[in-house]
Structures are given as C-alpha cells and as structure tokens.
Amino acid sequence: MANIKSAAKRAQIAERNRLRNKAYRSAVRTLIKNYLNAISQYSTDPTPEKLAEVHHRLNLAFSKIDKAVKRGVLHRNTGARRKARLTRILNKTLQPAA
C-alpha cells in the first residue's frame, strides 16, 4: 500500500482505468466474434439478408474499435490492424471461388 496520498490516489485511478479498459476490450472482442459468426453463417448459406447482417456486424465492430482507439484503450496501429484483418476476411469470403 502506498504511503503517500498522491500515490494512493494514482493507484486507485489506475485500477479504475484498468477495469474500464478491460470492459472496452471485452466489448471489442465480443463484436469481433459476432462478426466472425455472421461471416461463417453467410459462407454456409449466402443470402442477401445474411450479407446485410455481415455488413451490419462489421460496422458495429469498426465503430467499437475506433472508439477504443479514441479513448486510448487500443493503440492506433492495433486498431488499424484489427480492422484490416476483418476487412480481409470479408473480401476473401465475398470473392468468388476461382
């Protein structure tokens, strides 16, 4: 335990921020999983409704990733890398098998 009042306060703030960041990272991971599930459902049975669901899930994941970057939960490059990977998965799925 910290002996100095300011150090104790910083420890308290760090713990608060850690929990907040943990919740944000969890939300990002959940939305990415939802997107990947939508992609797998679309790949097994490609219909326009499922494609719309895939795009909707992608938009939700992108939004949450961008907000996490803006709040400092994720590094800018990490957010860009995750978005690029999600886009690459979508493009690979939509590409006709050649």
Curated annotation (Swiss-Prot):
Keywords linked to the UniProt accession: Ribonucleoprotein, Ribosomal protein, RNA-binding, rRNA-binding
Pfam families according to UniProt: Ribosomal_S20p
Domain of life, source organism: Bacteria
One term under GO cellular component: small ribosomal subunit
Listed transmembrane segments: none
GO BP, sorted A to Z: translation
Matches recorded under InterPro entries: Ribosomal_bS20, Ribosomal_bS20_sf
Coiled-coil annotated residue ranges, if any: none
GO molecular function annotations of the record: small ribosomal subunit rRNA binding; structural constituent of ribosome
Described purpose of this protein according to its UniProt entry: Binds directly to 16S ribosomal RNA.
UniProt family annotation: Belongs to the bacterial ribosomal protein bS20 family.
PANTHER family attached to this UniProt entry: 30S RIBOSOMAL PROTEIN S20, SMALL RIBOSOMAL SUBUNIT PROTEIN BS20C
Protein name as it appears in the record: Small ribosomal subunit protein bS20
Gene name as annotated: rpsT
